[in-house]
Amino acid sequence: MGLDMMQDNHLSAIPFKDNNRLSRTGTKMYVVNLMPGYNGIQYIAEKYALEKPVSVTVELVYSTDTFKPLKKNRENRVESYDFEINNAFDRGEIVGGFGYIEYTEPTKNKLIIMTLKDILKRKPDKASGEFWGGKKTAWEKGQKVEVETEGWFEEMCLKTVKREVYSAKNM
């Protein structure tokens, strides 16, 4: 498929303990799953698309930004959007994200919009606080304690929007 483990977020090797299989010595075996990351999903979607997009834009929308979707209708032949960053250095809280897929034939352009609720719906139930922010377990003075971490919330939201935009149903 052309994915490269040396590229960021292309392909990751994830080991799992397989409790159903035993080795000859009777110990549990491990299985390695090769999981494509969001850049790998993007690569596959663009490389194997029936109609290759000219450009794909993926952005997060913050509370101080101005975002206006322009959906296709009888007066507007091409789906599009207006997006303006009003305060680049203090954009506020994330309110959602969008992806815009542009084709050579403009009438095929597609706008995918995700609210913050849609993004958080895709967050795993047992998501690590280290990534999404929140509480994580740490060791301090030989004891397990829960600490609050900022995590990588923006990056996780952007990754989630990218996964949706580059999914098979949208490309």
Describe these PLM feature segments.
Residues M1-N170:
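Binding-interface segments
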